[in-house]
């Protein structure tokens, strides 16, 4: 009888250990490592976060951060470009493992996605055409028109302030619509607006209001299956922070270090 009990306990322990091992081996991070690549979604046309340079080489803050994370996890970075309004949908359906695209953390997004630690701290700004004296703050958007990327937090922000938002594909189109008077204003990241003005030399735009600091983080599908992936990404970001990689990327594209709150 004693021998039977010992044998039974051993079998139970063996099954339990096997179950635990299977769970670990079958989680998302393990599958990524087995396949050898991390599939990353980003826009590819949102300078300075992700864009093509004069030689059509994909570059930017998010591109370098994404590649740095993949390298530290020990896999290749497979970057897939897409429009903003499809990135988070693609994350939900499994098209991407993660999205690295200057994503800010909102309550609605937290219902569907888990987020890494922040890697950039930006601000959201309100931009109008020079001479637009009746819009001096976000509160003045009530009853006015803005242009923003479809499904973006900037679009949601404009609507929350009472604006009628025209959905467009990218920042350049937003700025063109403001410049030619089709819309009254646009809302976007301070870093992107500053980079656009610096790159184009346009002098007809004025920033009239800005938000508090906005942290950008990396979303992934919510659930236990991604716990180890989130931990690995946070570990990679911490290593990049400690060895100066994050700071160097920020200074390269923003001109200043925006990796600290």
Regions found by a protein language model. Name each.
Residues 21-23, 63-72, 150-152, 218-257:
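Extended ligand-binding regions for polar small-molecule ligands
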Residues 29-31, 128-145:
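Flexible hinge/capping segments at coil-to-helix
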Residues 24-102:
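Extracytoplasmic small-molecule ligand-binding "clamshell" domains
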Residues 40-43, 115-137, 219-220:
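Hydrophobic/proline-rich hinge and linker segments of small-molecule sensing/allosteric domains
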Residues 26, 78-90, 133, 152, ...:
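Short helix-initiation/N-cap motifs at beta->coil->alpha
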Residues 121-128, 190, 194-235, 256-261:
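Periplasmic-binding protein-like
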Residues 86, 103-111, 157-160, 179, ...:
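A ligand-binding cleft/hinge motif common to bilobed small-molecule-binding domains
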Residues 15-19:
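C-terminal motif of bacterial Sec signal peptides marking the signal peptidase cleavage site
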């Amino acid at each position: 009888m004693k021998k039977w009990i010992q044998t039974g306990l051993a079998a139970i322990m063996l099954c339990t250990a096997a179950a635990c091992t299977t769970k670990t081996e079958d989680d998302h991070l393990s599958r990524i490592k087995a396949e050898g690549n991390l599939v990353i979604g980003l826009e590819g046309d949102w300078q300075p976060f992700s864009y093509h340079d004069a030689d059509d080489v994909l570059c930017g803050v998010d591109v370098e951060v994404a590649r740095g994370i993949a390298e530290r996890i020990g896999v290749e970075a497979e970057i897939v470009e897409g429009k903003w309004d499809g990135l988070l949908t693609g994350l939900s359906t499994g098209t991407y493992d993660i999205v690295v695209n200057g994503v800010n953390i909102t309550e609605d997004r937290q219902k569907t996605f888990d987020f890494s630690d922040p890697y950039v701290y930006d601000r959201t700004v309100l931009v109008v055409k020079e001479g637009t004296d009746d819009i001096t703050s976000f509160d003045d958007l009530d009853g006015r028109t803005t242009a923003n990327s479809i499904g973006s937090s900037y679009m949601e922000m404009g609507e929350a302030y009472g604006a009628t938002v025209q959905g467009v594909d990218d920042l350049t189109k937003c700025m063109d619509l403001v410049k030619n008077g089709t819309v009254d204003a646009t809302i976007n990241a301070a870093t992107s607006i500053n980079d656009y003005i610096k790159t184009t030399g346009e002098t007809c735009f004025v920033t009239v209001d800005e938000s508090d600091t906005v942290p950008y983080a990396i979303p992934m599908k919510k659930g236990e299956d991604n716990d180890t992936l989130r931990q690995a990404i946070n570990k990679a970001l911490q290593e990049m922070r400690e060895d100066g990689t994050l700071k160097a990327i920020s200074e390269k594209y923003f001109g200043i270090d925006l990796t600290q709150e």
